[in-house]
UniProtKB/Swiss-Prot annotation:
Residue stretch of the organelle transit peptide: 1-38
PANTHER family hit by this protein: RNA HELICASE
Location of the Helicase C-terminal domain: 332-501
Region feature Disordered, mapped onto this chain: 585-668
Entry-linked Pfam families: DEAD, Helicase_C
Keywords from the UniProt entry: ATP-binding, Helicase, Hydrolase, Mitochondrion, mRNA processing, mRNA splicing, Nucleotide-binding, RNA-binding, Transit peptide, Translation regulation
UniProt-recorded name of the protein: ATP-dependent RNA helicase MSS116, mitochondrial
């Protein structure tokens, strides 16, 4: 009896075994089957081909109406076109508990992108690439299907990974998920976890979250270093690339390739990961990336029609042509003053290009408000700042404060240009051109959300007008209003506000590098840009002959004409700042650019040698080693330490002691 049973089992299984041996896409180890390359072929597994062949034989023989999965899903999705979330009830797509949660969050009507993408996301087998404009509800388009899967598969490890370019976007997506999860029964709630840079990961491998939102760099590190955590990703079903164009722009492609390999390395199921990619633009780079990470024959869904404008009509775009950099700051301050004076409730986002620019403008505005230089008829606004140099806690607090404020001004770098969904933003002000032309569109998209009216202002000097021409030619941007600054009754506010010397210097020093990026990106006149901004610097510090140290030009000032260098840059070291402050003028990390390379020796510190240059002394701390030595009060030291020729043993000992004290005081 047993012999006959084993013989029959061997006969029945032999075709499957033979097919497995012939297959190049599967490898066998014991009774475990796993795919080596999940997304490189439309035939995911030849076992499924055997099953479909057997079904086809049965259909031909018996004339039955067994469904062909692919066509049935397609016809089903074509016949079912939901308009409201209620339409999903009884259709088997979304659980009633999640639909009720959507209603409690006031999500009732589907946005156009949700109408077009929700059902295809549920039905897709090859993965989906979706072109969608910002602010159209795409987050909910992937949040609902992934939450539905996590709801049905609680306690089975990570089922969804959402990859985003910035921490701020991660917080925004987390908030959307939390809204939906909070209205589910406590024992039915899927777990949610953030794995992002700048904060400690609280992921618990014993009770892994079903949904993980991550920035690429941090997720790669965790998957490489924590085996227990990596095992929790063995059954990932959905992988979301949100703001994919931004992910590639900032150079995350190699990291995403590594993450892809790490996920498939720990994978225990033969099924491929369903990858969904969302992007405002789909160019050749996105297409090649999608073929590699989604599927060679990925499904493409375009929710942006030819008639759709990149910037909605409810946003009033205004171009203010300024005479120079000084006029630009003056007019922008007058514009802010007008908003504060004329409106009871308002939210304004002011975009600046570098971290030091944000620091300076924040201090500049708060000083003006504290001194009551703006004539206001009501309570002054709350002012917040946001940039990559702030901690996660500070950035989160700034965003939350700005969201709840009735009157608020957010001063930010490009980190707030994408993925930040703040309701009721009335005005967006861009004071400088963006390196990426698409960033203009994203910044403008922070206002006029959910169909409400908004106003976007761009301030441009004569040297920056070619950038405006590029916007019109490449992105079909149409300004409803073009104003010359001379026609505005702007008061001379810039003379009434005292600009902090240190932050002003840092702002203008790092701007030199940013202006070079603009020149190379848009072919602007570098000399004219530098002259405009250096004249602004002199106006702010109230010194008609103020100059910046030419040392900052060693890496970021190439291309400036000799006469401009002589006019605005000097080799003389200003004595009004100590060494650490002087160094910070060229600290690119504060401006959002790459950091200055350091020596491989961790103990090495930069030193200023006797020739007036900076060397790499591996043992000394940052110190000024010229003949003239200055203490913290910027006065010359006593003759004991100022002797430029011979010094006794006691003199050197005294100087060493003084140097340590100076460094210690600076660190404190």
């Amino acid at each position: 009896m047993l012999k006959q049973l084993s013989r029959s089992l061997g006969i029945r299984s032999s075709p499957i075994v033979a097919n497995l041996i012939r297959s190049k896409q599967v490898c066998t180890r014991g009774f475990h089957i796993s795919l080596v390359k999940q997304n490189t072929s439309s035939k995911v597994n030849e076992i499924t081909d055997i099953t479909s062949d057997s079904l086809k034989v049965k259909e031909d023989a018996a004339g039955s109406d067994l469904p062909s999965t692919k066509t049935d899903k397609k016809s089903k999705s074509e016949s079912f076109q939901p308009v409201k979330f209620e339409d999903f009830k009884g259709k088997g797509y979304i659980h009633d508990s999640i639909i009720n949660s959507l209603h409690k969050n006031d999500f009732k009507e589907l946005t156009p992108i949700q109408q077009k993408s929700l059902v295809p996301i549920f039905n897709t087998e090859k993965g989906l690439v979706c072109r969608a404009k910002t602010g159209t509800g795409k987050t909910l388009a992937f949040a609902v299907p992934t939450l539905q899967y996590a709801y049905k598969n609680r306690g089975k490890g990570v089922s969804t990974v959402v990859l985003v370019p910035t921490r701020d976007l991660a917080f925004q997506i987390e908030e959307e998920y939390r809204k939906l999860i909070s209205h589910l029964k406590y024992n039915e709630r899927p777990n949610l976890e953030l794995i992002i840079g700048g904060q400690r990961t609280s992921f618990n491998p014993r009770r892994p979250a079903e949904i993980v939102i991550a920035t690429p760099g941090r997720l790669e590190k965790e998957l490489q270093t924590d085996r227990k955590l990596a095992k929790c990703f063995s059954n990932v079903t959905y992988r979301i690339y949100d703001e994919a164009d931004r992910l590639l722009d900032v150079g995350f492609e190699s990291v995403l390739n590594e993450i892809d390999g790490l996920l498939y390395k720990v994978r225990t199921t033969p099924k491929p990961i369903k990858s969904l990619l969302f992007s405002a633009t789909v160019d050749e780079a996105i297409s090649e990336f999608s073929k590699k990470h989604i599927h060679p024959e990925y499904e493409f869904l375009n929710t942006v029609t030819k008639d759709d404008l990149e910037i909605p009509e409810n946003i009033h775009q205004q171009l203010i042509e300024c005479t120079d950099g000084i006029d630009k700051v003056n007019v922008s301050l007058s514009e802010l003053h007008g908003i504060m004076k004329q409106h009871n409730d308002y939210k304004v986002i002011v975009f600046l290009p570098t971290k030091t620019a944000v620091d300076w403008f924040y201090e500049y505005i708060t000083n003006a408000l504290d001194d009551e230089l703006f004539e206001l008829f009501s309570k002054p606004p709350r002012v917040f700042m946001l940039h990559g140099g702030r901690s996660v806690r500070q950035r989160s607090a700034a965003l939350k404060g700005f969201k709840v404020a009735k009157k608020g001004i957010l001063i930010s770098t490009d980190v707030a240009a994408r993925g930040i969904d703040v309701k009721d933003v009335t005005n967006v002000m861009q004071m400088f051109p963006s390196v990426e032309i698409a960033d203009y569109i994203h910044k403008v998209g922070r206002t006029g959300r959910a169909g409400k009216k908004g106003k976007a202002s761009l301030f441009a000097t004569p040297a920056e007008l070619p950038y405006v021409s590029l916007l019109k030619r490449k992105r079909k941007v149409k300004f409803q209003e073009v104003i010359q600054s001379e026609k505005l009754n702007s008061s001379n506010i810039i003379d009434q506000i005292e600009s902090p010397l240190d932050s002003t210097k840092e702002f203008l020093a790092t701007m030199v590098g940013y202006l070079q990026q603009l020149q190379s990106a848009h072919r602007l006149d570098y000399d004219s840009l530098v002259i405009e901004n250096m004249e602004l610097y002199r106006k702010l510090v109230r010194d008609d002959k103020a100059m910046l140290e030419s040392r900052i030009l060693s890496r970021i000032g190439k291309g400036i004409s000799a006469h401009v260098k002589r006019r605005y840059f000097t080799r003389t070291r200003y004595q009004s700042h100590d060494d650490a402050e002087f160094d910070s003028y060229s600290d690119f990390s504060r401006s959002g650019m790459s950091q200055r390379p350091r020596s491989n020796d961790r103990s090495s510190k930069m030193t200023f040698n006797g020739r007036g240059k900076y060397g790499n002394n591996r043992n000394n701390d940052w110190s000024y080693q010229n003949k003239n030595r200055y203490n913290n009060n910027n006065n010359r030291q006593t003759e004991r330490s100022y002797d430029s020729d011979r010094k006794s043993h006691n003199d050197w000992k005294y100087e060493k002691k003084f140097e340590h004290r100076r460094i210690r005081d600076h660190d404190e």
